[in-house]
Structure formats: C-alpha cells, structure tokens
Amino acid sequence: MGNKLGRKRQVVEERYTKPQGLYVNKDVDVKKLRKLIVESKLAPCYPGDDESCHDLEECPICFLYYPSLNRSRCCMKSICTECFLQMKNPNSARPTQCPFCKTPNYAVEYRGVKSKEEKGIEQVEEQRVIEAKIRMRQKEMQDDEEKMQKRLESCSSSTSAMTGEMEYGSTSAISYNSLMDDGEIAPSQNASVVRQHSRPRGNREDEVDVDLEELMVMEAIWLSVQETGTQRNSASGEITSSRQYVTDNHSYVSSPPRVTPIVEPATPSSSSGGLSCAISALAERQMVGESSSHNHNHNVNVSSYSMLPGNCDSYYDIEQEVDGIDNHHHHRHHYEMGETGSSNSYVSSYMTGEGFHNFPPPPPLVIVPESFEEQMMMAMAVSMAEVHATTTCAPTEVTWQ
C-alpha cells in the first residue's frame, strides 16, 4: 500500500558521470553534471566511437557514435552531453539558441536508447528530407538549362541576322562593282581601252565658297580663252599648210606638223585626282584636232592614247615620243639640207626611208565636267595650255623648192 509506480532509474557507472576530455571546458560544474546524469536528465558521457554500428547513434556536432544521446525539445535533434555543455555556457547572460533550428532558450532531455519505432520514424523523415533536397536540385538544374537554351536561341538569332546582313552587303557590293566595271570598261578594235572612273559627288558646300568676284573673273578668263582659241586656229591654218613640191620627180613631201607638248604642273587638286591630266589631254586634243582639220595629209605617228585618271605617266610618255619624232625629222632635215645643198637629195633621202605612214587619229577623249567648279577649272587649265603653247612653240619654217 502506498507504493508508487515509476520508471526504474538506469544505473550509470561513475566514470561516465564526468566529461571524457572531448573539449577543454573548465567552467563545467562536475557535481551538478553528475547529479543530472544520475537523475537521467542528461545522457551519460560515454566515450565516442569513430566507427558506426547499428546500436550506436551519431552526434551531428562531433560526428562520433554513442549508445544514447540527448534530444532537443524544439526540433528533437540528437546531441551528445559534451557538445551540449559546449553549446550551453552557464556563465553567459545571453540565451542559447538551438544549433539546428535557431530557437532561443535551447534545452534538451534524455529519453534513453531509441526504440526500433523511433529509429524507423527518423529514417523516414531523413528520406523525405533527402528527396526534397533532390527535387530542389533538379529544379535548379532545369532552370539553368532553360536559361542556357534561351541564351543560345538569342545568340543564334543574332548571328543569323548578322550573317544575312553580311551576305546582302556582299551581294550588293558585287553587283555594284560589276555595274561599275561594265559602265567604265569600253573595248575598242583599233584603240586601247580607256577607263574613266566616275568620281562620286560629295557635299562641297562647306569646302567651296565662290563669291561674285571670283565668278566674274572666271567668266572673263573663259571669254579670253575663246578669243585666244580663234586666233590660234587662224594662225595654225596658215603655218601648217606646208607642202614641198618637187618638180623633177613630180612628187611632194609633207612636213609633219609641230605638236607642242603641254605639261601642266603636277599639283594636287581637291576636286579630283586626275582632273588636271584630263584637262591637259583635252587641250592637246583640241589643238591637234584644229591643226589636223586644216591639213588632212599631215598626221602624227601616235600608236595609242591611254590615260588613266590620276596617273599622267603614259600621257607624258606619249608627248615625249611625239617630241622625239619631231626633233628627229627636224634635225635630219637641216642636216641633209646643209650637206647636199639641194632639195633633190633631201627628197631622195627622205623618200628612200620607210614609206608614208598613215597615222590614225587618236581616239576621242570624252570628258564631261560634272559641276560648275570643274568647268571653271577646265577653263583655267585650257587657258594656261594655250598661253604656254603660244610662248614655247615657234612656227615651223616653210621652204618652197
């Protein structure tokens, strides 16, 4: 009668009632600790084992295996007594938080060794946690793959757009070049190929500032050029009509006309690179055409005229050839006249050489100024060419025999 039923206390050995030296903690009250262990409020301080066993539990703090562990009241997580004493500092005024769920006022209780049912429940919970972690990881990987796919699609679309633009630009450039080549290259049968690249027009409003005074000066120059041209035509018609009649052989020898080389100073032009060469060639062409219109039987032995815009080397070579031919015939004429003193020897020596050459007229050079500025520049160049021709070209003496 009067006996009280209760749980039988576990008999704990004395050596398990004090710390085993896992941590160096001098603030532990050994007497109080022993009392709590004897009263089964804390788990005994068993020595931890490194190897796992089916009867042992692992402490998630020190990762050692013990026969029994304490349990957190907040989250029911297991922890050994020495780790709990390390977390729960008795001299600290701040409340201790749970190392697992961060709940304040951390406290534990000892329930003894876990039963099979409790171990099964813990395993199920652990499995759920693992599955949840796996699902989260898979979702993160799927999101990363979707982002990468979107980036690849955007990059491929931008690359295809750039490729299309490049192809369109290349085809348009090829078509433009083919059109330019077809328009610029004009093949001829008896003359060389003449190329004249069209210069693109630009906005010259900022570069060219032509006032009224300059326009009047240019107009006066143009009028003077026209007057000089008419005078030059009349003078050249009288000079170039020279024929040497030979009464003995009833034949005549035509003296070749004097072609005056016109060399313009090679100064760079802001309007076009080859404009000065083109203007010089046009001026010479006009002079040669005017002289040949009065004398149909006198032609200059010029094989071909080929002039590229911006390059006057071939033009100067042609002039030097023409000058050399004239000088050769002129010196030969005077030398033979002085040696024999008669026209018969000159005629015979001149006629015994190569026969008369029918020199084809040079092909026409079509140069059309594009703007008023180029027209004024052409007028000035023609005027300079005419003045240079009148000052440097001496009239050829005509001797009738």
From Swiss-Prot:
Keyword terms of this UniProt record: Developmental protein, Metal-binding, Transferase, Ubl conjugation pathway, Zinc, Zinc-finger
Catalytic activity as recorded in UniProt: S-ubiquitinyl-[E2 ubiquitin-conjugating enzyme]-L-cysteine + [acceptor protein]-L-lysine = [E2 ubiquitin-conjugating enzyme]-L-cysteine + N(6)-ubiquitinyl-[acceptor protein]-L-lysine
Effect of N91L: No effect on E3 ubiquitin-protein ligase activity
EC number: 2.3.2.27
Pathway of action: Protein modification; protein ubiquitination
Disruption phenotype: Increased organ size, biomass, and seed size and weight.
InterPro entries the UniProt entry points to: Sip5/DA2 (IPR039301), Znf_RING (IPR001841)
Biased composition range(s): Basic and acidic residues: 139-153
Recorded superkingdom: Eukaryota
GO molecular function, one term: ubiquitin protein ligase activity
Zinc finger (RING-type): 59-102
Annotated region described as Disordered, given as residue ranges: 139-164
GO biological process, one term: regulation of seed growth
Transmembrane segments: none
Other known facts: 'Da' means 'large' in Chinese. Plants overexpressing DA2 exhibit reduced organ size, biomass, and seed size and weight.
Function: E3 ubiquitin-protein ligase involved in the regulation of organ and seed size. Acts synergistically with DA1 to regulate seed size. Functions synergistically with DA1 to restrict cell proliferation in the maternal integuments of ovules and developing seeds. Seems to function independently of BB. Possesses E3 ubiquitin-protein ligase activity in vitro. Polyubiquitinates DA1, DAR1 and DAR2, but not DAR3.
PANTHER family per the UniProt record, alphabetical: E3 UBIQUITIN-PROTEIN LIGASE DA2, PROTEIN SIP5
Complex and partners: Interacts with DA1 (via C-terminus).
The name this protein goes by in its record: E3 ubiquitin-protein ligase DA2
Organism: Arabidopsis thaliana (Mouse-ear cress)
Gene this protein is translated from: DA2
